[in-house]
Amino acid sequence: MAESIVKLEIVLVCLAKFVKAVTQIEKKRLLQRKLEMKILGIGNAIVDVICKVNDNFLINNNLTKSTMKLVDEKEFQKLLENLKIERTISGGSVANSIVGLSQLGNEVGFIGKVSDDHLGRKYAEGLEKEKVKYHYNIKSESIPTGTCLILITPDSERTMCTFLGTAGKISEIDIDEKIVKQSKITFLEGYLWDKGDPQKAFNKAISSSSQSAMSLSDLFCVERHREYFLDLVKRKLNITFANEQEIMALIKTKNFKDVIDFAKKIKKLVVITRGENGAMAIQNDTIVECNAQKNLKIKDLTGAGDLFAAGFLHGHVNKLSLEESLKKGTELSSKIIQQVGARL
């Protein structure tokens, strides 16, 4: 009898240890799930100031339609002097994409820089409201939060004048490798190259990530940093987003067939928006196309590329086909251009 009791006690002790071990494993698993993000964005934290102008305003101020120009704070205020502000809203290219991804139900994060000022605090609060994690690095310094003057002409095209402010100070120190490693995809924007020391920050983010993606951002941005961008696209990035003009400028061609040949050769995923001609994804020898939606009441093209990227990445990270991912990108892009502002 005594021997049976001892054996039972041993069994109970072993069972208790087993249950404890399983519980600890389950806790670790749940914690890991909690920490995991599908997509982490790294980009300029910018507040958009939206104004409507005519073409003469662009001509008189030496602005090229549909592009982004970097300005200092004084020039920004001078441009704004005689304009009526239609709307002020948190923006930034990758941040817009990340918010769109969050609205689609994805776990997302954002790394960017704002100042400890009114706009910076509002920016951070806005991302918190959209359930974006790890989203800002507030700096108490004299440089204000970045702002972008978005000028919308009657044809709904947008021309941007950006004062980067604190957003342009992002550096290697701001890239937390632990956070990067928690995400399935790290999504960066070409605009980051315009200020500061982005090369080390980019390399740190890309080397720590499972998959890396980047938007080429803007035609002039490509022309400013073509050599670096070409190296990134060919050797380091898994996914590249660009519009037709940007990707053609990158490889210095006027023939779109050259773009297709280039994308096939590098054997990466290249996703291209083509305006009225729809969108295209090229991966190895596979080419998939999606038609643009027709008969839209276009109000503002500001967030078209940002929300397209959000829709495509949503499909990609959730293992949808290239065709389905393109359709999702086209769907979101079509929605955003029928309103003013780059966030749904």
Q: Where on the chain are the PLM-derived regions?
A:
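Charged/polar low-complexity intrinsically disordered segments
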Residues: 3, 9, 24-27
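Glycine-rich phosphate/adenosyl-contacting loop at the front of the ribokinase-like
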Residues: 33-111, 121
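Ribokinase/PfkB-type carbohydrate-kinase core domain
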Residues: 34-63, 86, 124-139, 143, ...
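Conserved post-catalytic alpha-helical subdomain immediately downstream of the catalytic base
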Residues: 102-103, 265, 269, 293-344
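Glycine/charged-rich beta-loop-alpha catalytic/anionic-binding loops adjacent to active sites
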Residues: 74-85, 130-131, 287-296
